[in-house]
Swiss-Prot record:
Pathway: Carbohydrate biosynthesis; gluconeogenesis; Carbohydrate degradation; glycolysis; D-glyceraldehyde 3-phosphate from glycerone phosphate: step 1/1
Protein name according to UniProt: Triosephosphate isomerase
PROSITE patterns, per database record: TIM_1, TIM_2
Subcellular location: Cytoplasm
Alphabetical list of InterPro entries matching this protein: Aldolase_TIM, TIM_sf, TrioseP_Isoase_bac/euk, Triosephosphate_isomerase, Triosephosphate_isomerase_AS
Lineage of the species this protein comes from: Bacteria, Pseudomonadati, Pseudomonadota, Gammaproteobacteria, Enterobacterales
Induction: Induced by CsrA and repressed by spermidine.
List of residues binding substrate: 9-11, 173, 212, 233-234
Length: 255
Protein backbone atom coordinates (compact mmCIF):
# COMPACT_ATOMS: atom_id res chain seq x y z
CA UNK A 1 0.00 0.00 0.00
CA UNK A 2 1.30 3.45 -0.92
CA UNK A 3 1.98 5.86 1.94
CA UNK A 4 0.59 9.33 1.13
CA UNK A 5 2.87 12.37 0.98
CA UNK A 6 1.76 15.97 1.40
CA UNK A 7 4.45 18.50 0.54
CA UNK A 8 4.39 22.25 0.96
CA UNK A 9 6.02 24.38 -1.73
CA UNK A 10 6.64 27.78 -0.15
CA UNK A 11 7.80 29.27 -3.46
CA UNK A 12 9.32 32.77 -3.09
CA UNK A 13 8.00 33.35 0.41
CA UNK A 14 9.83 33.42 3.70
CA UNK A 15 11.81 35.19 6.39
CA UNK A 16 13.57 33.98 9.52
CA UNK A 17 10.57 35.04 11.56
CA UNK A 18 8.16 33.23 9.24
CA UNK A 19 10.21 30.02 9.28
CA UNK A 20 10.24 29.99 13.08
CA UNK A 21 6.52 30.74 13.40
CA UNK A 22 5.31 28.45 10.62
CA UNK A 23 7.39 25.40 11.51
CA UNK A 24 6.63 25.81 15.23
CA UNK A 25 2.92 25.93 14.48
CA UNK A 26 3.17 22.99 12.08
CA UNK A 27 4.79 20.91 14.81
CA UNK A 28 1.81 21.60 17.08
CA UNK A 29 -0.82 21.09 14.40
CA UNK A 30 0.71 17.84 13.12
CA UNK A 31 1.53 16.25 16.48
CA UNK A 32 0.17 12.71 16.41
CA UNK A 33 -0.10 12.47 12.62
CA UNK A 34 1.56 9.22 11.57
CA UNK A 35 -0.37 8.03 8.52
CA UNK A 36 0.89 10.64 6.08
CA UNK A 37 4.43 11.72 5.25
CA UNK A 38 4.97 15.49 5.41
CA UNK A 39 7.63 17.60 3.72
CA UNK A 40 8.16 21.32 3.24
CA UNK A 41 10.26 23.12 0.64
CA UNK A 42 11.25 26.60 1.82
CA UNK A 43 13.51 28.87 -0.24
CA UNK A 44 17.04 27.43 -0.18
CA UNK A 45 18.51 29.90 2.31
CA UNK A 46 15.94 28.83 4.92
CA UNK A 47 16.21 25.04 4.52
CA UNK A 48 18.85 24.67 7.21
CA UNK A 49 16.92 26.83 9.68
CA UNK A 50 13.67 24.98 8.93
CA UNK A 51 15.43 21.66 9.50
CA UNK A 52 16.61 22.81 12.92
CA UNK A 53 13.13 24.08 13.78
CA UNK A 54 11.61 20.75 12.69
CA UNK A 55 14.07 18.59 14.66
CA UNK A 56 12.34 15.88 16.65
CA UNK A 57 9.21 15.99 14.47
CA UNK A 58 8.20 13.93 11.43
CA UNK A 59 8.45 16.96 9.12
CA UNK A 60 10.96 16.37 6.32
CA UNK A 61 12.72 19.00 4.25
CA UNK A 62 12.82 19.56 0.54
CA UNK A 63 13.89 22.12 -2.02
CA UNK A 64 12.26 23.84 -4.98
CA UNK A 65 14.96 23.32 -7.61
CA UNK A 66 18.42 21.88 -8.23
CA UNK A 67 21.25 22.37 -10.72
CA UNK A 68 22.63 19.63 -12.98
CA UNK A 69 26.19 20.14 -11.78
CA UNK A 70 27.61 18.95 -8.47
CA UNK A 71 30.26 21.69 -8.20
CA UNK A 72 32.25 24.17 -10.26
CA UNK A 73 31.95 27.55 -11.93
CA UNK A 74 28.15 27.80 -12.07
CA UNK A 75 27.32 31.11 -10.44
CA UNK A 76 24.06 31.27 -8.53
CA UNK A 77 23.29 27.56 -8.67
CA UNK A 78 22.76 24.96 -5.93
CA UNK A 79 23.80 21.34 -6.41
CA UNK A 80 22.16 18.10 -5.33
CA UNK A 81 25.19 17.41 -3.15
CA UNK A 82 24.68 20.73 -1.34
CA UNK A 83 20.98 20.08 -0.80
CA UNK A 84 21.79 16.65 0.54
CA UNK A 85 24.41 18.14 2.84
CA UNK A 86 21.91 20.49 4.50
CA UNK A 87 19.27 17.80 4.90
CA UNK A 88 16.85 18.33 2.01
CA UNK A 89 15.43 15.04 0.73
CA UNK A 90 12.44 15.82 -1.53
CA UNK A 91 13.48 17.98 -4.47
CA UNK A 92 10.89 19.57 -6.74
CA UNK A 93 11.80 19.59 -10.43
CA UNK A 94 9.83 20.52 -13.52
CA UNK A 95 7.41 22.85 -11.77
CA UNK A 96 5.36 24.75 -14.32
CA UNK A 97 6.78 28.05 -13.06
CA UNK A 98 10.30 26.79 -13.85
CA UNK A 99 9.16 25.45 -17.23
CA UNK A 100 7.48 28.78 -18.06
CA UNK A 101 9.73 31.46 -16.58
CA UNK A 102 13.07 29.69 -17.00
CA UNK A 103 12.26 27.80 -20.21
CA UNK A 104 13.23 24.44 -18.68
CA UNK A 105 12.76 21.62 -21.18
CA UNK A 106 11.65 18.03 -20.62
CA UNK A 107 15.20 16.95 -21.47
CA UNK A 108 16.78 19.25 -18.87
CA UNK A 109 14.31 18.16 -16.21
CA UNK A 110 15.04 14.49 -16.95
CA UNK A 111 18.74 15.19 -16.42
CA UNK A 112 17.98 16.81 -13.07
CA UNK A 113 15.94 13.72 -12.18
CA UNK A 114 18.96 11.50 -12.90
CA UNK A 115 21.31 13.66 -10.82
CA UNK A 116 18.96 13.52 -7.84
CA UNK A 117 18.66 9.74 -8.05
CA UNK A 118 22.45 9.41 -8.22
CA UNK A 119 22.72 11.45 -5.02
CA UNK A 120 20.12 9.37 -3.19
CA UNK A 121 17.58 12.19 -3.14
CA UNK A 122 13.88 11.95 -4.01
CA UNK A 123 12.78 13.73 -7.19
CA UNK A 124 9.32 15.26 -7.09
CA UNK A 125 8.65 15.42 -10.83
CA UNK A 126 5.97 17.96 -11.73
CA UNK A 127 4.00 17.35 -14.90
CA UNK A 128 0.82 18.85 -16.30
CA UNK A 129 -0.90 20.65 -19.12
CA UNK A 130 -1.71 24.29 -19.76
CA UNK A 131 -5.28 25.55 -20.11
CA UNK A 132 -4.94 25.64 -23.90
CA UNK A 133 -3.63 22.06 -23.97
CA UNK A 134 -6.45 20.96 -21.68
CA UNK A 135 -9.09 22.58 -23.88
CA UNK A 136 -7.51 20.98 -26.96
CA UNK A 137 -7.83 17.54 -25.36
CA UNK A 138 -4.05 17.10 -25.08
CA UNK A 139 -3.78 16.40 -21.33
CA UNK A 140 -2.73 12.76 -21.73
CA UNK A 141 -0.38 13.55 -24.62
CA UNK A 142 1.43 16.23 -22.59
CA UNK A 143 1.70 14.12 -19.44
CA UNK A 144 2.98 11.13 -21.41
CA UNK A 145 5.64 13.27 -23.11
CA UNK A 146 6.85 14.69 -19.81
CA UNK A 147 7.03 11.24 -18.18
CA UNK A 148 8.68 9.70 -21.24
CA UNK A 149 11.58 12.14 -20.94
CA UNK A 150 12.59 10.10 -17.89
CA UNK A 151 11.20 6.69 -18.91
CA UNK A 152 13.01 6.58 -22.25
CA UNK A 153 16.38 7.70 -20.89
CA UNK A 154 16.45 6.06 -17.46
CA UNK A 155 13.85 3.31 -17.57
CA UNK A 156 10.92 2.63 -15.26
CA UNK A 157 13.29 1.67 -12.44
CA UNK A 158 14.18 5.35 -12.08
CA UNK A 159 10.70 5.95 -10.68
CA UNK A 160 11.26 3.55 -7.78
CA UNK A 161 11.04 5.70 -4.66
CA UNK A 162 10.33 8.82 -6.72
CA UNK A 163 7.30 11.10 -6.61
CA UNK A 164 5.23 12.49 -9.48
CA UNK A 165 3.09 15.59 -8.96
CA UNK A 166 0.33 16.13 -11.48
CA UNK A 167 -0.24 19.88 -11.55
CA UNK A 168 -2.64 21.15 -14.21
CA UNK A 169 -1.08 24.53 -14.98
CA UNK A 170 -4.49 26.17 -15.28
CA UNK A 171 -5.23 25.29 -11.64
CA UNK A 172 -2.05 26.65 -10.02
CA UNK A 173 -2.64 29.75 -7.95
CA UNK A 174 -5.87 30.45 -9.81
CA UNK A 175 -8.36 29.12 -7.30
CA UNK A 176 -9.52 26.67 -9.98
CA UNK A 177 -9.07 22.98 -9.33
CA UNK A 178 -9.67 19.85 -11.32
CA UNK A 179 -12.68 17.97 -10.01
CA UNK A 180 -11.78 14.83 -8.04
CA UNK A 181 -13.00 12.72 -10.97
CA UNK A 182 -10.93 14.70 -13.48
CA UNK A 183 -7.82 14.48 -11.31
CA UNK A 184 -8.32 10.75 -10.72
CA UNK A 185 -8.64 10.10 -14.45
CA UNK A 186 -5.28 11.76 -15.14
CA UNK A 187 -3.59 10.07 -12.18
CA UNK A 188 -4.83 6.69 -13.41
CA UNK A 189 -3.54 7.50 -16.90
CA UNK A 190 -0.10 8.36 -15.45
CA UNK A 191 0.04 5.12 -13.46
CA UNK A 192 -1.16 3.06 -16.42
CA UNK A 193 1.40 4.74 -18.69
CA UNK A 194 4.26 3.68 -16.42
CA UNK A 195 2.69 0.23 -16.00
CA UNK A 196 3.13 -0.40 -19.72
CA UNK A 197 6.85 -0.57 -18.93
CA UNK A 198 6.79 -1.89 -15.35
CA UNK A 199 3.55 -2.63 -13.47
CA UNK A 200 5.26 -3.08 -10.10
CA UNK A 201 6.96 0.31 -10.24
CA UNK A 202 3.72 1.93 -11.40
CA UNK A 203 1.83 0.49 -8.46
CA UNK A 204 4.24 1.84 -5.84
CA UNK A 205 5.03 5.30 -7.27
CA UNK A 206 3.47 8.17 -5.33
CA UNK A 207 1.40 10.47 -7.54
CA UNK A 208 0.42 13.73 -5.86
CA UNK A 209 -2.15 16.24 -7.05
CA UNK A 210 -0.99 19.85 -7.20
CA UNK A 211 -3.53 22.39 -8.32
CA UNK A 212 -5.11 24.74 -5.77
CA UNK A 213 -5.45 22.04 -3.11
CA UNK A 214 -7.05 23.51 -0.01
CA UNK A 215 -8.84 22.56 3.19
CA UNK A 216 -12.22 22.40 1.47
CA UNK A 217 -11.37 20.12 -1.46
CA UNK A 218 -8.61 17.93 0.01
CA UNK A 219 -10.72 15.12 1.47
CA UNK A 220 -12.63 14.50 -1.75
CA UNK A 221 -9.43 14.52 -3.81
CA UNK A 222 -7.68 12.07 -1.47
CA UNK A 223 -10.64 9.69 -1.57
CA UNK A 224 -9.62 8.88 -5.16
CA UNK A 225 -7.63 5.63 -5.45
CA UNK A 226 -4.72 6.99 -7.50
CA UNK A 227 -4.23 10.31 -5.68
CA UNK A 228 -1.50 9.75 -3.09
CA UNK A 229 -1.28 13.17 -1.46
CA UNK A 230 -0.66 16.70 -2.64
CA UNK A 231 1.92 19.28 -3.60
CA UNK A 232 0.51 22.35 -1.88
CA UNK A 233 1.31 25.97 -2.70
CA UNK A 234 -0.50 28.85 -1.01
CA UNK A 235 -2.20 26.75 1.67
CA UNK A 236 1.21 25.49 2.87
CA UNK A 237 2.00 28.99 4.19
CA UNK A 238 -0.66 28.66 6.90
CA UNK A 239 -0.09 25.94 9.48
CA UNK A 240 -3.76 25.30 10.21
CA UNK A 241 -4.77 25.06 6.54
CA UNK A 242 -1.81 22.82 5.69
CA UNK A 243 -2.55 20.57 8.68
CA UNK A 244 -6.15 20.07 7.52
CA UNK A 245 -4.83 18.84 4.17
CA UNK A 246 -2.33 16.48 5.81
CA UNK A 247 -4.97 15.06 8.15
CA UNK A 248 -7.38 14.62 5.24
CA UNK A 249 -4.76 12.54 3.40
CA UNK A 250 -4.13 10.45 6.51
CA UNK A 251 -7.84 9.82 7.06
CA UNK A 252 -8.60 9.01 3.41
CA UNK A 253 -5.84 6.47 3.06
CA UNK A 254 -6.66 4.76 6.37
CA UNK A 255 -10.34 4.43 5.46
Amino acid sequence: MRHPLVMGNWKLNGSRHMVHELVSNLRKELAGVAGCAVAIAPPEMYIDMAKREAEGSHIMLGAQNVDLNLSGAFTGETSAAMLKDIGAQYIIIGHSERRTYHKESDELIAKKFAVLKEQGLTPVLCIGETEAENEAGKTEEVCARQIDAVLKTQGAAAFEGAVIAYEPVWAIGTGKSATPAQAQAVHKFIRDHIAKVDANIAEQVIIQYGGSVNASNAAELFAQPDIDGALVGGASLKADAFAVIVKAAEAAKQA
